[in-house]
UniProtKB/Swiss-Prot annotation:
Location in the cell: Cytoplasm
Catalysed reactions, semicolon-separated: tRNA(Glu) + L-glutamate + ATP = L-glutamyl-tRNA(Glu) + AMP + diphosphate
PANTHER family assigned to the protein according to its UniProt record, in alphabetical order: GLUTAMATE--TRNA LIGASE, GLUTAMATE--TRNA LIGASE, MITOCHONDRIAL-RELATED
Oligomeric form and interacting partners: Monomer.
Protein name, entry field: Glutamate--tRNA ligase
UniProt-listed Pfam families: Anticodon_2 (PF19269), tRNA-synt_1c (PF00749)
GO MF annotation terms: ATP binding; glutamate-tRNA ligase activity; tRNA binding; zinc ion binding
Function: Catalyzes the attachment of glutamate to tRNA(Glu) in a two-step reaction: glutamate is first activated by ATP to form Glu-AMP and then transferred to the acceptor end of tRNA(Glu).
Organism expressing this protein natively: Streptococcus equi subsp. zooepidemicus (strain MGCS10565)
Gene symbol of the encoding locus: gltX
Highest taxon of the lineage: Bacteria
Entry EC number(s): 6.1.1.17
Gene Ontology CC, one term: cytosol
Motif ('HIGH' region): 11-21
Motif ('KMSKS' region): 255-259
Length: 481
């Protein structure tokens, strides 16, 4: 009988939720939900130097905003933070020490640095050289006594089988093999402060929580042989590993970097700008995976049903901010007006634009939105001075037919009663100008749009004129004549 599917997302509370970590969480979530398994959240907080206050809450809040839920977490289960599990780690440290599979190391940082320097000068690959090498039992005992008398606190190192072969069949990469001699020698599993190192603690946690599959970024591939060594030393079966490809900047082809200012890389940024979480979820789900076919817009339920780990890409996933914004715009265009208005309302309020026409303005510009914060610059026409025309717009307005069109349309607006001044009645007035003047197409619509809004392109012209108001529209046209 196969093991129950149990996967985990194990963030460090060291800052905001990055798009790469969000993808790790999302793929684990999709895998668990597709197979009817459990999705576990565990907090890896043993690196106290990098600990950020409120980092854990921020991670969980942003996951929830994305639409990711979980079955187990520190909120509902005890000892799901590594800092609460130190006694468990110590139990296995003691076991490995007692079995001779690990040992206490008294070498100092200064000695390690000097040895690295010597190795580099000699053209050797830096590695730890066992400090007890060549010592007799008496010499070893004397060395330890001397170090302890000097107050040196030891680390604990795992004794590496240099001749060992560590291999696994990766869910994404296929068969991967590492030689034990290539991990840099016996490595530290417990630091001087008593905290375990990452590669030791993660094995204890995954085994204790019965994790069946470890799905993570391929920057963890080099960690896997070390983790397999711990599984071997403790006599445990390792989980199935899957390493997702890097996320690269679509413009540079290089690994996504915090210096890439042309991309929004943290989920908090998308929240603050008023993106629709469903759109961000959809976009991230396609970073390194696709269900086949041409379709790109999927609901969460569809993605769960379609998720097939065999379609995880072996090639780097290109992060394209323009693609993200296109996808977000698709969601805005098809969303309920009430939901879009709720997203836009805080931005309009902050800009002092929460008037009685606010919801109508949102409806007008909804098809153009990729994020709710865009509603403020889009509505400048209704709250700011008339914009300066561009050279292209001035060229359009210099055509000899423009005065004829504007004068005729201005007269149509002036003749309309307040009761008749509605979007559905404005378009027939434009068509009447066409009939009377014989001017049509761009030569008709473009001058009216530029005269009214100061822009060549925009939302539906009758709605723009209606929301701007009859008097304001007439004034704008008059200023162009």
């Amino acid at each position: 009988m196969s093991k129950p599917i149990r996967v985990r997302y194990a963030p460090s509370p060291t800052g905001l939720l990055h798009i790469g970590n969000a993808r790790t969480a999302l793929f684990n979530y999709l895998y668990a939900r597709h197979h009817g398994g459990d999705f576990v959240i565990r907090i890896e907080d043993t690196d106290r130097k990098r600990h950020v206050e409120d980092g854990e809450r921020s991670q969980l809040e942003n996951l929830r905003w994305l639409g990711i839920d979980w079955d187990e977490s520190p909120e509902t289960h005890e000892r799901y933070r590594q800092s609460e599990r130190l006694a468990l780690y110590q139990q296995y440290i003691d076991q490995l020490l007692a079995e001779g599979k690990a040992y206490k190391s008294y070498v100092t940082e200064e000695e390690l640095a000097a040895e690295r320097e010597r190795q580099e000068a000699a053209g050797e690959t830096p590695r730890y050289v066992n400090e007890y090498l060549g010592m007799s039992a008496d010499e070893k005992a004397a060395y330890i006594a001397e170090r302890e008398a000097a107050g040196i606190v030891p680390t604990v190192r795992l004794a590496v089988n240099e001749a060992g072969i560590y291999k696994w069949t990766d869910m994404v990469k296929g068969d991967i093999v590492f030689e034990g001699g290539n991990v840099g020698g016996d490595w530290v599993i417990q630091k001087k402060d008593g905290y375990p190192t990452y590669n030791f603690a993660v094995v204890i946690d995954d085994h204790d929580m019965q994790i069946s599959h470890v799905i993570r970024g391929d920057d963890h591939i080099a960690n896997t042989p070390k983790q397999l060594m711990v599984y071997e030393a403790l006599g445990w079966e390792a989980p199935v590993f899957g390493h997702m490809t890097l996320i690269i900047n679509s413009e540079t082809g290089k690994k996504l970097s915090k210096r890439d200012t042309n991309t929004l890389q943290f989920i908090e940024d998308y929240r603050k700008k008023g993106y629709m979480p469903e759109a961000v979820f959809n976009f991230i789900a396609l970073l390194g995976w696709n269900p086949g076919g041409e379709a790109e817009i999927f609901s969460r339920e569809q993605l769960i049903a379609l998720f097939d780990e065999s379609r995880l890409s072996k090639s780097p996933a290109a992060f394209d901010q323009k693609k993200m914004d296109w996808m977000s715009n698709e969601y805005f265009k098809h969303a309920d007006l009430g939901a879009v208005y709720a997203l836009c309302k805080p931005f309009l309020e902050a800009a002092g634009r929460l008037t009685e026409k606010a919801e109508k303005l949102v409806e007008l510009y909804q098809p153009q939105l990729s994020s709710a914060d865009e509603i403020v610059p889009l509505t400048d026409l209704f709250f700011s001075d008339f914009p300066e025309l561009t050279a292209k717009e001035k060229e359009v307005m210099a055509a000899e037919t423009v005065p004829t069109v504007l004068k005729a349309f201005k007269e149509k607006l002036e003749a309309m009663s307040d009761e008749d001044f509605k979007p559905e009645n404005i378009f027939p007035q434009i068509k009447a100008v066409q009939k009377e003047t014989g001017i049509k197409g761009k030569n008709l619509f473009m001058p009216i749009r530029i005269a009214v809004s100061g822009e060549m392109h925009g939302p539906e012209l009758p709605n723009t004129i209606y929301l701007l108001g009859r008097e304001q529209s007439i004034e704008h046209i008059a200023n162009m004549l």
